[in-house]
Design a protein with these regions (language model features):
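A SIS-like phosphosugar-recognition module
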Residues: 1-103
Length: 103
C-alpha cells in the first residue's frame, strides 16, 4: 500500500516501453514524493525514469509481448544478490522438498 512508502521502503518498478509507460512514470513520481527508494528496470536509453529512480537496471528494447521474459532476469539476479547479502542459503532454500512421483 502507498501509505507504507517512506525513505526506508525500497520499491521495485518495471518501467519498460509499453502502453502503460506514462502511468508507471506517474506512479514513480508519486513514490518519489513520499521519499521512497526506487529500483527500476528500464529500457536501454530511457532518460525519464533514469532521472527519477535511485537505482536502474537496463534491459534491451524488445517488443511488449516479450518484455516479461527480458525483465525477469534482472529481477531474479536482484533477489539472488539480496539473499546472499542477507546470508541466506540460495542453494538449499528452507521448506523446499523434492517430490518424486513414480507410476
Amino acid at each position: 500500500p502507498i501509505a507504507l512508502i517512506d525513505e526506508q521502503m525500497p520499491i521495485v518498478v518495471i518501467a519498460v516501453n509499453s502502453n502503460h509507460y506514462d502511468k508507471v512514470v506517474s506512479n514513480i513520481q508519486e513514490i518519489k514524493s513520499r521519499k521512497g527508494k526506487i529500483i527500476a528496470v528500464v529500457t536501454e536509453g530511457d532518460t525519464v525514469v533514469k532521472e527519477l529512480a535511485d537505482y536502474i537496471m537496463e534491459v534491451p528494447n524488445t517488443p511488449e509481448t516479450l518484455s516479461p521474459l527480458v525483465t525477469t532476469i534482472p529481477l531474479q539476479l536482484l533477489s539472488y544478490h539480496i539473499a546472499l547479502m542477507l546470508g541466506r542459503n540460495v542453494d538449499q532454500p528452507r521448506n523446499l522438498a523434492k517430490a518424486v512421483t513414480v507410476e
